[in-house]
Design a protein with these regions (language model features):
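Short acidic active-site motifs
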Residues: 9-10, 60-64
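Non-catalytic, surface beta->alpha helical segment in thiol-disulfide oxidoreductase systems
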Residues: 72, 78-105
Length: 105
Protein backbone atom coordinates (compact mmCIF):
# COMPACT_ATOMS: atom_id res chain seq x y z
CA UNK A 1 0.00 0.00 0.00
CA UNK A 2 1.28 3.45 -0.88
CA UNK A 3 1.82 5.82 2.05
CA UNK A 4 0.49 9.36 1.67
CA UNK A 5 3.26 11.82 0.83
CA UNK A 6 3.47 15.47 1.88
CA UNK A 7 6.16 17.96 0.85
CA UNK A 8 7.85 17.84 4.27
CA UNK A 9 8.38 14.08 3.81
CA UNK A 10 11.08 14.72 1.22
CA UNK A 11 13.57 15.99 3.78
CA UNK A 12 12.28 13.80 6.61
CA UNK A 13 12.10 10.51 4.71
CA UNK A 14 13.14 10.46 1.05
CA UNK A 15 16.63 11.90 1.61
CA UNK A 16 17.27 9.30 4.34
CA UNK A 17 15.86 6.16 2.73
CA UNK A 18 17.97 3.91 0.53
CA UNK A 19 15.24 3.61 -2.13
CA UNK A 20 11.96 5.52 -2.37
CA UNK A 21 9.29 5.35 -5.06
CA UNK A 22 6.78 8.19 -5.42
CA UNK A 23 3.70 8.12 -7.63
CA UNK A 24 2.83 11.74 -8.43
CA UNK A 25 -0.86 12.00 -9.27
CA UNK A 26 -3.93 14.22 -9.25
CA UNK A 27 -7.47 13.50 -8.09
CA UNK A 28 -8.93 14.30 -11.53
CA UNK A 29 -6.53 12.01 -13.44
CA UNK A 30 -8.05 8.81 -14.84
CA UNK A 31 -4.74 7.06 -15.63
CA UNK A 32 -3.56 7.92 -12.09
CA UNK A 33 -6.60 6.18 -10.63
CA UNK A 34 -5.90 3.13 -12.81
CA UNK A 35 -2.23 3.02 -11.75
CA UNK A 36 -2.89 3.36 -8.00
CA UNK A 37 -4.02 -0.26 -7.37
CA UNK A 38 -1.07 -1.52 -9.42
CA UNK A 39 1.33 0.55 -7.33
CA UNK A 40 -0.41 -0.55 -4.10
CA UNK A 41 0.17 -4.18 -5.11
CA UNK A 42 3.80 -3.57 -6.10
CA UNK A 43 4.43 -1.67 -2.85
CA UNK A 44 3.56 -4.85 -0.96
CA UNK A 45 5.58 -7.04 -3.31
CA UNK A 46 8.70 -4.83 -3.08
CA UNK A 47 8.30 -3.66 0.53
CA UNK A 48 11.70 -5.07 1.50
CA UNK A 49 13.47 -3.18 -1.30
CA UNK A 50 11.87 0.29 -1.25
CA UNK A 51 9.41 2.64 0.44
CA UNK A 52 6.41 3.60 -1.69
CA UNK A 53 4.48 6.88 -1.57
CA UNK A 54 1.50 8.56 -3.23
CA UNK A 55 1.78 12.33 -3.78
CA UNK A 56 -1.14 14.44 -5.00
CA UNK A 57 0.44 17.31 -6.94
CA UNK A 58 -2.48 19.56 -6.00
CA UNK A 59 -2.72 18.61 -2.33
CA UNK A 60 0.36 18.17 -0.18
CA UNK A 61 2.87 17.29 -2.89
CA UNK A 62 2.78 20.60 -4.75
CA UNK A 63 6.30 21.81 -3.97
CA UNK A 64 7.97 18.42 -4.42
CA UNK A 65 6.14 17.89 -7.71
CA UNK A 66 7.23 21.31 -8.92
CA UNK A 67 10.84 20.77 -7.81
CA UNK A 68 10.85 17.40 -9.60
CA UNK A 69 9.65 19.06 -12.80
CA UNK A 70 6.42 17.07 -13.01
CA UNK A 71 4.77 18.01 -16.32
CA UNK A 72 2.26 15.18 -16.60
CA UNK A 73 0.59 12.66 -14.35
CA UNK A 74 0.90 9.95 -13.42
CA UNK A 75 4.65 10.17 -12.99
CA UNK A 76 6.53 7.60 -10.93
CA UNK A 77 10.00 8.61 -9.73
CA UNK A 78 12.53 6.36 -8.03
CA UNK A 79 14.92 8.07 -5.60
CA UNK A 80 18.03 6.73 -3.89
CA UNK A 81 18.92 8.77 -0.80
CA UNK A 82 16.89 11.66 -2.24
CA UNK A 83 18.53 11.64 -5.67
CA UNK A 84 16.37 10.82 -8.68
CA UNK A 85 17.44 7.61 -10.40
CA UNK A 86 14.72 7.27 -13.06
CA UNK A 87 11.14 8.19 -13.87
CA UNK A 88 8.23 6.82 -15.84
CA UNK A 89 5.50 9.13 -17.12
CA UNK A 90 1.99 7.99 -18.01
CA UNK A 91 -0.18 5.04 -17.22
CA UNK A 92 1.49 1.70 -17.90
CA UNK A 93 0.52 -1.94 -17.45
CA UNK A 94 1.68 -3.75 -14.33
CA UNK A 95 4.29 -5.74 -16.29
CA UNK A 96 5.97 -2.53 -17.51
CA UNK A 97 5.98 -1.01 -14.03
CA UNK A 98 7.52 -4.20 -12.64
CA UNK A 99 10.29 -4.03 -15.26
CA UNK A 100 10.87 -0.38 -14.36
CA UNK A 101 11.19 -1.25 -10.66
CA UNK A 102 13.41 -4.28 -11.28
CA UNK A 103 15.76 -2.16 -13.39
CA UNK A 104 16.09 0.57 -10.76
CA UNK A 105 15.77 -0.92 -7.30
Amino acid sequence: MLADFKDEDFDNKIRNEDVSVIQFSAAWCGPCKALKPIMDKLAVEYKDKASFYYADIEDGGINTGSAAGIRGVPTVIIYKKGVEVDRKVGGVPESHMKEFLEKNI
